[in-house]
Amino acid sequence: MEEKKVALITGGTRGIGKAIAIKFAQNGYNLVLNYVSDRTNLEELKQEFKKYNIEVLFIKTDVSKFEECENMVKLAIEKFNKIDVLVNNAGITKDSLLLRMTPEDFEKVININLKGTFNVTKSIVPYMMKKRTGKIVNISSVVGVSGNAGQCNYAASKAGIIGFTKSIAKELASRNILANCVAPGFIDTDMTSVLSENVKESINAQIPLKRMGRSEEIANSVYFLAGEENTYITGQVLNVDGGMLM
């Protein structure tokens, strides 16, 4: 019987991250998922993943802290002896216009979104290099490409992820490790569900497909780049945005 592959997904307990985790579970991957403090939905998730006949390891990890990321990877390797796929999805927003933004809110977003991506990737790459194989998919955003008023911290973090990904793709290609970005547009999640209907309508008007994306559509794109069928794409940014950026 073929050994199951292992995917480590940060921010994988809710929203887009949860959809990504489910996609990998459906395809028989064992999972490593981090959580920060909220354990309320972990039992529910455990039950949900049971039907896929896989193992899931939940590890409390603040991705902005390098030592915690190192420990998460160490525990994952002890459990599964490998990590085939890394999806850096953990992210937060602290939106405000530049004139009102506090240095603390700028730093928090950079620390989770960009530094967190560095921390987890740096912790995992030595194991992938030893195996001479691996897939890394980092979740950026269309605002990392285009910018967005009121989100200079978030846009900077997501633009940084693109530069980071292209750089590591060049460094790791000789070891058969592929690194790519998925850049979602407006996606229908808990974060967007609080928006008023008027705001949603104005957002949809900017999108050629006239609707927000679904988390599952992001998950499908991530799985394509991280799955076995991708053997020749690296250092790329896949915009999944309903045609916003062309």
List where the protein language model places each region.
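Conserved glycine-rich cofactor-binding loop
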Residues: 13-15
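Conserved glycine-rich Rossmann-like NAD(P)H-binding loop of the short-chain dehydrogenase/reductase
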Residues: 27-44
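Substrate-binding pocket helix/loop in short-chain dehydrogenase/reductase
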Residues: 97-98, 105-110, 203
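C-terminal substrate-recognition "lid" of short-chain dehydrogenase/reductases
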Residues: 118, 133, 177, 211-240, ...
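Active-site helix of classical SDR
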Residues: 121, 157, 165
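Alpha-helical segment proximal to the catalytic Tyr-Lys
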Residues: 126, 170-174, 231
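Residue(s) in the substrate-gating loop at a strand-loop-helix junction
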Residues: 141
